[in-house]
C-alpha cells in the first residue's frame, strides 16, 4: 500500500491545496493531510477549526484522512503512519528554491523518505494562504 502525508499549516486550506491533494490521491492508496502549527506565524488559529474546514472540502475522498500535528517532526509522523512519501506543492521557481531546503531537511532526518512534488494548475498558482488571510483581515 502506498501511503503519503500532505503536511502544512493550511491556514486556510484553499483551492490550491485541494488541487495538489486531488493529484496526490490519483497516485497513493492513502493520503493523510497533516495539519500543523506554524511556529513562524503568529496568530495561528485553532488547529481544530482548520481541520473542520478541510473536512468539509474533502468529504467525498475515501482515501484521505486528516490528523493534527501538535509538535512532531514531519518525518516522525510519516514513520508512525508507515508513510514513505511526503507530498509538497509547487507554484513557482521561488517555491522550488524554498522546497529544496525542505527536501534536504527531510532526507537528513530520514534518508528513506521520498518527497513528491506536484505542480499547481495554472489557475491555482496565485493562491496563497498568507494573501487570503490578509484579504480577510482588511475586509473587516
From Swiss-Prot:
Q: Which Pfam families match?
A: CTP_transf_like (PF01467)
The Swiss-Prot or TrEMBL record describes its family as follows: Belongs to the bacterial CoaD family.
One GO molecular-function entry = ATP binding
Subcellular localization is given as: Cytoplasm
| The organism of origin for this protein | Mycoplasma capricolum subsp. capricolum (strain California kid / ATCC 27343 / NCTC 10154)
Q: For ATP, which residues are the binding ones?
A: 9-10, 17, 89-91, 99, 124-130
Query: What function does the entry list?
Result: Reversibly transfers an adenylyl group from ATP to 4'-phosphopantetheine, yielding dephospho-CoA (dPCoA) and pyrophosphate.
**Binding of substrate, residues:** 9, 41, 74, 88
Q: How does it assemble?
A: Homohexamer.
Sorted UniProt keywords: ATP-binding, Coenzyme A biosynthesis, Cytoplasm, Magnesium, Nucleotide-binding, Nucleotidyltransferase, Transferase
Question: Is-annotated flag, keyword Transferase?
Answer: yes
Please provide, in alphabetical order, the Gene Ontology terms of the cellular component aspect for this entry. Answer: cytoplasm
The molecule here is called: Phosphopantetheine adenylyltransferase
Amino acid at each position: 500500500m502506498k501511503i503519503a502525508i500532505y503536511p502544512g499549516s493550511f491556514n486556510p486550506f484553499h483551492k490550491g491545496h485541494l488541487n495538489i491533494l486531488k493529484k496526490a490521491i490519483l497516485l497513493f492508496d492513502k493520503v493523510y493531510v497533516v495539519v500543523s502549527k506554524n511556529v513562524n506565524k503568529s496568530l495561528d488559529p485553532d488547529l481544530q477549526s482548520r481541520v473542520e474546514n478541510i473536512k468539509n472540502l474533502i468529504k467525498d475522498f475515501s482515501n484521505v484522512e486528516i490528523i493534527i500535528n501538535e509538535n512532531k517532526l514531519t518525518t516522525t509522523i510519516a514513520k508512525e503512519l508507515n508513510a514513505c512519501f511526503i507530498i509538497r506543492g509547487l507554484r513557482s521557481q521561488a517555491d522550488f528554491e524554498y522546497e529544496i531546503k525542505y527536501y534536504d531537511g527531510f532526507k537528513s532526518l530520514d534518508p528513506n523518505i521520498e518527497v513528491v512534488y506536484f505542480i499547481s494548475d495554472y489557475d491555482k498558482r496565485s493562491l496563497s494562504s498568507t494573501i487570503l488571510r490578509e484579504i480577510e483581515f482588511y475586509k473587516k
